[in-house]
Each structure stands twice: as C-alpha cells, then as structure tokens.
C-alpha cells in the first residue's frame, strides 16, 4: 500500500474508489494499491 498526496491510475485495471472519505486505488496488481494520505 502506497500512501501518496495524489493517487493516479497506474494501469487499465486500476479503479479509483472513495472509502470513508479517503481516495483509494484498487487493482489486480497488488503493487498498484494506493491511498491518499
């Protein structure tokens, strides 16, 4: 899980989701998991 000030899609399978007020990226590739911090 990467914590970043700006989250971006890294590939076509990445999905941006807002969960409990934080932006998250979920993807089939675990390296692409991110959350805005």
From Swiss-Prot:
Keywords from the UniProt entry: Chloroplast, Plastid, Ribonucleoprotein, Ribosomal protein
A GO MF term: structural constituent of ribosome
Subcellular localization(s) per the UniProt record: Plastid, Chloroplast
Domain of life of the native organism: Eukaryota
GO biological process, one term: translation
InterPro entries membership: Ribosomal_bL36, Ribosomal_bL36_sp
Protein name: Large ribosomal subunit protein bL36c
